[in-house]
UniProtKB/Swiss-Prot annotation:
This is Short chain dehydrogenase tazN. Pathway: Secondary metabolite biosynthesis. NADP(+) binds at residues 45, 99, 126, 160, 195, 199, 229. The keyword Oxidoreductase applies. InterPro entries: NAD(P)-bd_dom_sf (IPR036291), SDR_fam (IPR002347). One of its GO terms (molecular function) is oxidoreductase activity, acting on the CH-OH group of donors, NAD or NADP as acceptor. Keywords: NADP, Oxidoreductase. Pfam families: adh_short (PF00106). Induction: Expression is positively regulated by the azaterrilone A cluster-specific transcription factor tazR. Short chain dehydrogenase; part of the gene cluster that mediates the biosynthesis of azaterrilone A and other azaphilones, a class of fungal metabolites characterized by a highly oxygenated pyrano-quinone bicyclic core and exhibiting a broad range of bioactivities. The first step of the pathway begins with the non-reducing polyketide synthase tazA that assembles one acetyl-CoA starter unit, five malonyl-CoA units, and catalyzes a series of Claisen condensations, methylation, PT-mediated cyclization, and finally releases the first hexaketide precursor through the R-domain.
Length: 456
């Protein structure tokens, strides 16, 4: 079991104990890879000669993958033998000599895997290093940058080279990129600047990769747990007062990754997943975490990533009551509109026209997309589940005129609608309240507001 909440934990991250009611430090029966069937799938894992990568390769083999390639700089003979002994029907195993920081080496690896497998279903960017501890002013620039070279440039080069192989797989099949990140992406621990910067940047690379290739290729990041592997110098290198923190096993992350990619789960795209969370419980909360978009992207999901930065301001989990299965089902099946297209967000009349056009086709509104080029006037323009709840008495007639009176509000407020609904005198207070609720976050991509897509 990970350390309890009341114990000191220098690596306690956002949402560690809040996302699921149970947490784990070792694998558990519900995610046993032998219960899954990945027959016919092909997988490539980087940094697989030891530690987490080795465990992931073994977990995939136990799940029945047909082909598995592992990239590493060191020998993979012992891993090949272990895979053969662990499986009744061992997969085709391809050892690949790989330096993730070398573009030519990565390109050669992609060519080799493509020639042997033809396509790819899962890519795991696992290779990484910790680097030396030290204050920034005392650090060696080459050593400091080498950590980013391995932890960020490496996943970039590998993703760049292997995406074409993922795209060759059937659109209906599983196609995943899993980036092995770290809770360190969210922490600020002096003397670990290079490592934590690299992992924070890897989170952004994850969301961007998913934005560019999802939902066809689903990209998400994991925190594997705090395992005392070789990257830490092994268990003996952990100081006595921190040993209670480094308790997760490599098998936990290996089995967790296999469980997550065993089915197509578009809603995982762009997210950060902590492997200590109870994953069956997590996937059961899909309807709580995601809101399907109806008008333009029927199979897409609204961009509310749980990136773990501050769970208390994360719309994916804040203020949500536990729903019954039937309530969750209805929420998941519900379709919502997205207001898109060019308009002058400084003019209330144009905002009202846009809302009316949207609600003509669907009486519910999920999101009003603002113009990112005018942050002072449009700000974040996220509006989730509107109705007259917040302004029930004063603005009921106005909401009804917009056909929005039957929706539900979670508290999200956009600058202009705060002004419209609350009146100019209440605008500042309304915006401040929205910030307190943690809803004015994550500016929307410019292409979503400036794409030129207009409503019918």
């Amino acid at each position: 079991m990970p350390p309890s909440k009341d114990q000191p934990n220098i690596l306690r991250g956002p949402g560690d104990y809040e996302v699921t009611t149970r947490v784990h430090n070792d694998t558990y029966p519900e995610i046993d890879p032998r219960l899954l069937n990945l027959q016919g799938k092909s997988v490539f894992v980087t940094g697989g000669s030891r530690g987490l990568g080795r465990s992931m390769a073994l977990s995939f083999a136990k799940a029945g993958v047909s082909k598995i390639a592992v990239g590493a700089r060191s020998s993979l003979e012992s891993l090949a033998k272990e895979i053969a002994e662990a499986c009744v029907n061992p997969p085709e195993f391809l050892p690949v000599k790989l330096d993730v920081t070398d573009e030519a080496s990565v390109a050669a690896a992609a060519t080799e895997v493509g020639r042997a497998f033809g396509q790819l279903n899962v890519l795991v960017n696992n290779a990484g290093i910790l680097g030396k501890y030290g204050l920034i002013a005392d650090s060696d620039p080459e050593e400091w940058w080498e950590v980013l070279n391995v932890n960020l440039r490496g996943p970039y080069l590998v993703t760049r080279a292997f995406v074409p192989l993922l795209l060759k797989a059937s659109k209906d099949d599983i196609r995943y990129i899993v980036n092995v990140c770290s809770v360190g992406a969210h922490l600020t621990n002096p003397t670990l600047s290079s490592y934590q910067v690299s992992k924070n940047a890897l989170l952004k690379l994850t969301t961007l990769t998913n934005a560019e290739y999802g939902p066809g290729v689903i990209t998400f990041a994991i925190h594997p747990g705090n395992s005392p592997t070789d990257i830490m110098g092994g268990p003996e290198a952990i100081p006595p007062h921190h040993k209670h923190v480094f308790v997760e096993t490599p098998e936990l992350s290996g089995d967790s990754v296999v469980f997550l990619v065993s089915k197509r789960r578009e809603w995982l795209g762009g997210r950060y997943i902590n492997c200590t969370w109870d994953l069956p419980e997590l996937v059961s909360k899909e309807a709580e975490i995601c809101i399907p978009v109806g008008l333009y992207q029927a199979k897409e999901y609204v961009d509310i990533p749980f990136n773990g930065l501050r769970p208390e301001i994360d719309t994916a989990f804040q203020g949500r009551k536990q729903r019954t299965p039937e309530q969750a089902r209805r929420a998941q099946l519900a379709k919502y509109n997205v207001v898109k297209g060019g308009m002058d967000n400084r003019r209330d009349s144009q905002i009202f026209i846009r809302i009316k056009r949207s609600t003509k086709h669907n009486p519910r509104l999920v999101r009003l997309v603002g113009n990112k080029s005018r942050p002072a006037t449009s700000g974040i323009c996220r509006v989730d589940f509107f109705d007259c709840t917040a302004q029930k008495q004063r603005d009921k007639a106005q909401w009804q005129s917009l056909k929005l009176s039957k929706a539900q509000v979670t508290g999200s407020v956009v600058t202009h609608l705060t002004q419209i609904l609350s009146g100019n005198s209440q605008r500042t207070a309304g915006i401040q309240r929205a910030r307190e609720l943690g809803q004015i976050i994550w500016p929307l991509a410019a292409e979503q507001s400036d794409s030129g897509n207009s409503l019918p």
